[in-house]
């Protein structure tokens, strides 16, 4: 009987060692999951050892970085070699100089104290962005001088052609103000109030978008809506404009296309930028928006569509601060809340209660006659008398 139990114990012990599974997961570059547009010339790699056993420690690692998924010899830009280290967070890239607007693939092998054989991660990737200021070939674009102080929101457009087969297309864009970009009638990305607030005098963040699937063979159009945002503002209690960071809003963009024949170019001709005005009469972080839906033009960013009263755009002053890639989470729509209660105040105002404090905007349908003015105001609480 004792021999039977001993044999059973040995068998189970052997099974637990051979069945031990080690996975290398959660690959990150600069603590980001497959970032698109990263501007760091010396990024840092991180990974996690995933196992259901205790006391599994990394003893060595080996990182590979290449410009193709198969890590061919010609595409390899870094092989760290087998490094004796427990480090698995912020491992420095020490390979060849990284190129701008280029996709890189990477994987890591890990050795542990529990096995002489290595475990290898799946292949991950990241896309470099505009690594230096000189990669921004375009100038900043703005309205002409006579429209500089207008609170209306300009709609900029630029037409261009794509006649060769492309393998990638990336838009890099930022603004002094807030922007919303479109290509061929479709909104680019889902972030709100881009590029987000920073100390504009010192630093502005740019965003990068993969727009390859949005482009057409032949005629194309890029469109940019530009609002004051945090950059400058009009105050309701002041007749003059309050300049927070500058007198004039502007934006800069690079649409970089890589072709199947090996060419890469920034496709937008800045001399082709023009603008007109649409339904947004004013837009302010502090005072909300005024919109005239009679002026809505849903085809303004469609290729070939002629926008009325277009004006030639102007090149704005260069930005003296630092432009870097957005690393923080952007403002996005997270959920849709329905109204919970309609409250009639003692003075007869209609208050719609959503049941919780929130940041967002209102969507509603109306059968009111054309020309009716609707005013929506927002607040957190009613006063002691129940008034808005």
Go through the PLM ranges and name each one:
Residues 1-23:
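Bacterial Sec-dependent N-terminal signal peptides
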Residues 22-388:
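Extracellular/oxidizing-compartment recognition motifs
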């Amino acid at each position: 009987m004792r021999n039977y139990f001993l044999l059973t114990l040995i068998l189970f012990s052997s099974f637990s060692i051979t069945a031990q599974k080690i996975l290398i997961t959660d690959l990150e570059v600069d603590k980001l999951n497959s970032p698109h547009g990263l501007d760091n010339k010396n990024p840092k790699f991180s990974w996690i050892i995933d196992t259901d056993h205790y006391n599994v420690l990394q003893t060595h690692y080996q990182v590979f970085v290449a410009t193709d998924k198969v890590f061919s010899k010609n595409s390899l830009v870094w092989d760290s070699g087998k490094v004796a280290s427990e480090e698995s967070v912020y491992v420095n890239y020490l390979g060849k100089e990284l190129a701008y607007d280029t996709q890189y693939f990477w994987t890591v092998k890990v050795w542990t104290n529990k096995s002489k054989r290595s475990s290898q991660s799946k292949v991950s990737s990241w896309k470099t962005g505009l690594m230096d200021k000189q990669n921004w070939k375009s100038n900043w674009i703005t309205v002409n001088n006579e429209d500089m102080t207008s609170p209306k929101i300009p709609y900029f457009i630029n037409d261009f052609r794509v006649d060769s087969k492309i393998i990638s297309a990336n838009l890099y864009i930022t603004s002094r103000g807030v922007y919303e970009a479109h290509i061929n009638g479709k909104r680019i990305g889902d972030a709100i109030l881009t590029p987000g607030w920073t100390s504009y005098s010192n630093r502005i963040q740019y965003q990068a978008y993969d727009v390859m699937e949005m482009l057409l063979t032949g005629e194309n159009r890029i469109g940019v809506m530009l609002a004051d945002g945090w950059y400058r503002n009009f105050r309701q209690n002041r007749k003059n404009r309050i300049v927070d960071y500058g007198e004039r809003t502007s934006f800069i963009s690079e649409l970089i296309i890589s072709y199947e024949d090996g060419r890469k170019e920034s496709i937008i001709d800045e001399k082709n930028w023009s603008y007109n005005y649409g339904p947004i009469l004013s837009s302010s972080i502090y005072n909300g928006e005024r919109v005239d839906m009679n002026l809505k033009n849903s085809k303004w960013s469609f290729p070939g569509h002629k926008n009325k009263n277009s004006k030639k755009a102007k090149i704005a002053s260069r930005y003296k601060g630092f432009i870097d890639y957005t690393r923080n989470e952007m403002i996005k729509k997270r959920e849709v809340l329905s109204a919970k209660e309609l409250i009639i105040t003692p003075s007869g105002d209609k208050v719609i209660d959503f049941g919780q404090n929130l940041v967002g905007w209102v969507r509603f349908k109306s059968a009111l006659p054309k020309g009716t003015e609707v005013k929506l105001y927002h607040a957190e609480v009613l006063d002691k008398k129940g008034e808005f």
